[in-house]
Swiss-Prot record:
One of its GO terms (cellular component) is DNA-directed RNA polymerase complex. GO terms for molecular function: DNA binding; DNA-directed RNA polymerase activity; ribonucleoside binding. It comes from Tolumonas auensis (strain DSM 9187 / NBRC 110442 / TA 4). This is DNA-directed RNA polymerase subunit beta. NCBIfam families: PRK00405.1, rpoB. It comes from the Bacteria. The gene is rpoB. DNA-dependent RNA polymerase catalyzes the transcription of DNA into RNA using the four ribonucleoside triphosphates as substrates. It catalyses: RNA(n) + a ribonucleoside 5'-triphosphate = RNA(n+1) + diphosphate. The RNAP catalytic core consists of 2 alpha, 1 beta, 1 beta' and 1 omega subunit. When a sigma factor is associated with the core the holoenzyme is formed, which can initiate transcription.
Amino acid sequence: MVNSYTEKKRIRKDFGKRDQVLETPYLLSIQLDSFKQFLDADPEGAYGLEAAFRSVFPITSYSGTAELQYVSYRLGEPVFDVKECQIRGVTYSAPLRVKLRLVLFDKEAAAGTVKEIKEQEVYMGEIPLMTDNGTFVINGTERVIVSQLHRSPGVFFDHDKGKTHSSGKVLYNARVIPYRGSWLDFEFDAKDNLFVRIDRRRKLPATIILRALEFTTEEILTTFFETIKFEIKDGKVLMELVPERLRGETATFDIVAGGDVVVEKGRRITARHIRQLEKAGISQIEVPVEYVVGKISARDYVNPQTGEVMINANTALSLEAIANLSQAGFKQFEVLFTNELDHGSYISETLRIDSSTNRLEALVEIYRMMRPGEPPTKDAAEQLFENLFFSADRYDLSTVGRMKFNSRLARPDHIGSGILSQDDIVDVMKQLIAIRNGKDDVDDIDHLGNRRIRSVGEMAENQFRVGLVRVERAVKERLSLGDLDAIQPQDLINAKPISAAVKEFFGSSQLSQFMDQNNPLSEITHKRRISALGPGGLTRERAGFEVRDVHPTHYGRLCPIETPEGPNIGLINSLAVYSRTNEYGFLETPYRKVIDGVITDEVDYLSAIEEGNFVIAQANANVDADARLKDELIPCRHKGESTFMNAEQIQYMDVSPQQVVSVAASLIPFLEHDDANRALMGSNMQRQAVPTLRADKPLVGTGMERAVAVDSGVTVVAKRGGTIDYVDASRIVVKVNEDELLPGEAGIDIYNLTKYTRSNQNTCINQRPCVSVGEPVMLGDVLADGPSTDLGELALGQNMRVAFMPWNGYNFEDSILVSERVVQEDRLTTIHIQELSCIARDTKLGPEEITADIPNVGEAALSKLDESGIVYVGAEVKGGDILVGKVTPKGETQLTPEEKLLRAIFGEKASDVKDSSLRVPNGVYGTVIDVQVFTRDGVEKDKRAKEVEDMQLRDAKKDLTEEFKILEDGIFGRARSLLIANGFGEDRLSKLDRKRWLEQSLDDEGKQVELEQIAEQHIALKEEFDRKFEAKRQKIIQGDDLAPGVLKIVKVYLAVKRRIQPGDKMAGRHGNKGVISKICPVEDMPYDDEGNPVDIVLNPLGVPSRMNIGQILEVHLGLAAKGIGEKIDRMVKEQRELAELREFLQRVYDLGGSDQQQIDIATLSDDDVRTLVQNLRKGLPVATPVFDGAKESEIKELLKLADKPESGQITLFDGRTGMPFERVVTVGYMYMLKLNHLVDDKMHARSTGSYSLVTQQPLGGKAQFGGQRFGEMEVWALEAYGAAYTLQEMLTVKSDDVNGRTKMYKNIVDGDHRMEPGIPESFNVLLKEIRSLGINIELEEE
């Protein structure tokens, strides 16, 4: 049952069959949680600012006599609040203050003797703060930091898919990726030698790195190979027999066991032979000496008598060598066990091409590769190698990297050091060799277990650390210089590098983006966006198909539908609805536990890696009343594949059918009936919908509308329950419920609303209250609607009555025919607010001045300006009008004697200033709704600035006074009830002044204390009010902090009302987009037998080939929903009984849907029912959740209940002839959006204007006031017509024949309409370019 007060006003009928196990999570948590983690001091020091400080501090001087230690940090209060920052164009940030301790050690005394300790708090720059809605205000504009999907640190094994070598041989490689530090790659070449690369440089044999780690040849061989032991006995050679090793080999001699020949010479050894040998239990067999020749020695063999090396490790044995061994008294020797199949001799081969023999040579070789051209020294080489992978300052795998590294190498524990160890490198090589030997598989780098999310907090921390490292260098320098006794921590730290790093990240990083603020959905989607681009990510050009493609692990984590079209497709994704990141940054999605075929309500979040181990059923599996899976075979997913399994084998089940898709896709009703390409366009176009003048909830929704509207932060949501005490257009006051009060608090919540402000996309942000005085509200109730919301539900467009039929070719190729009624009723009218600013600077020739005294400008042009030269609020302006008058000093020109004389007589003339006023751009018209004036400190404010200041002060005082009065009333109300409860009569109190109430004395000691507490609260409130007002006053009065050289900034805000017109782009939610071709008079539109005309006529041919059938179902369901509303409306007009209305509503809400979501009308009070009925008269809102929506039968039932034809088709009549069309037409209600591609912004014309410098052709594009390009194809068209003279004119005088242009102008002035075409400038450019190639080319006249 619906419980919130707002929802009761208009209950959406839900067709969903599955009950909701998990509430939709808070949609912005990925941003807010990540940044909170960054700012909160983590006692472990594992993440956030704390981690950055701990990783850089303590900083020790080079000599070790001083150390700067980090103690703690705190964030101060921001100077301005979010709104003030946006108006003033500054960053919303807080100062960071860090407590540092400088410890000085005594040089002479024993090491570690402390001489002096100084502790001090140091300012370390400003940290931008996140607003409550997950955005940052940087230089006055709202920005979003998009999360990044990057390759997780760890170790990855891969191959080149046979592309590197011409033979098509698959070459395997391994790569160790740290969180920061050098990459380490191992790779095979076509000859099966193993190489190593550091940071993708020149490759070296892989054994070099082992030698650098102090391995000898013998140790390398015993680490990587199994050995075969041979024994020399009585002149015979006996081999240790390990039967398993012989499988698949061909016997080169008879293998004898117990006198029987088990395998004859030349036969392949099979599993049967091996079983016989194992049965015989032989441990050694005799082999011919030739069998041993050519095997590789595993050890160095040194002659005990002479001490000389007889056989080096990794050399092939010869007959002579074996004889020598025997002579020298060696009874046993070992060789490497290799074979072609699964024990390759790769390391042994690699050792042969490795020129280094000891550690130093290996280090020098690595040094030469990393620093070519520098002479290596022993220390430098050792230092370099040490710093590459074994120094915590330069290399960090991070906890994630270590976890991934250890789990890939199948180690039991997942924690360890952030640097590499000797074992790590050896294990990676072993694993790579095992993969090359066919014992393991390569990784899939597009698997979401190998890609992790880096969110705001983590990226900010990395940037902060970069700044700190820069500071560390400077501190070390300072510590080694000069007198340490006089130095304070403050003197050591320069906050500039830190501020610069942080500022650069928030201001200009690729992932810090200008927020898409078209509507609430575009905001929420932008904050939930996951990009694979950006620093440390992919680039558009290099990303192949695999990275962009949908991967099985995307299920429930990233949306398979919502991604941009074009070059970024698949690189920018959107989080799925229920998805979240785990502690390591991998995406998880929730599943319900299934035990023995019974579904429980226990929910587990699984990451992509964990998910692979389980069998997971879909959310729409059939379930009986006991929550037991019904079917014998159930479709499910296991290890990334879809299969069928028995109920008992199933371990988990999806939480909800919509967990696959993102927020935008989950707002498309009947998504399951749309083709994926169109769904992609649908989810992208919803983000471009412009908020209409009056928001209209969708009749056919999906049930996600409320979550989006509330979570996006455009609505005002109650923080606590209570009763509405006061409402006007700009504030709502709630009297809080007694049980939700904090001790000693006034119990009043005041919500201020945003009025007519500009969004990033120039749309209008305005909040309207949707509650009235006396209404009860609960925590989380919507109190005021924002842009594109209607009663707390997302409302991006309008419900339009549409007909699918051709209409005189006006809906050819997706064009849309719209009725004039839509324009008259302002259904698709939008308000756009533009900000124009005028800056007065201090120039070399003197200051610019804002004034109404502008040279050579008539009275008419100044009519809209006040005496300060600034336009009035409320003035209606059009292109070319002056908004702010400004004059700029001109350079002194040489005056003629005559002018000097005139000057002397008439005083200064206005010739030394030029007009540089702010004018309205061409093609823009609108009303001035606000003017802001910012004046630099120390510059006198003009009259207008003072007026603005006075108004702000008045408003601030009024706001605070009202706020104070409300809170004061609350305090007196409590005092009054306390006094009345203690025997004071109403009359007695009404005679006393209110302030005297607080001075009364009561008999009850406890009550007296309570009254005194109330009196104290009143005093505190008064002081708080005075303090707040003073702070506000100071902020308003003080000069503004403007950029250097700027004296004044005037910002003018224009509101433009845009009605719908031909050329505007509209769309439905199913990717069905089109451009308006004609606004048709109402009387010409097709109408039904009741005389109701349709609003929009769409082309039926737009449906079959696009395969977005969802729009047809939406239209049918919309017709039914509207029909129910009309029926309720008729019942109200006929003044039917409330009981009858209740009964009808109950029938409507009971139709279809699940038992869990039933709505019991009987539980609503009469007033509630009246409100509900009033809100349903325009149509019954229905929800058809994604993949769990209304069935065809249910739509038909609802149509029947609404007295509409079940086919959804009706006979229409031609508005012009009055004749019926020859067959029935599908008519219904579709939710249509007006997209932010308005013809007003695109239409553009030019006659003359600026020209390109080199080619002298007109510029292109509206922004440059360019011309229309007469391109190659247009030239062909004129050629085809044989219109030679027209063509000549187009390519010469109308384009870039400079002399021809000026001559033609002169001719026209003289009244002679002839033209003389000359040589186009671009031809001259071509000549010059050919000459630049050294070819002389000249035009000779005949």
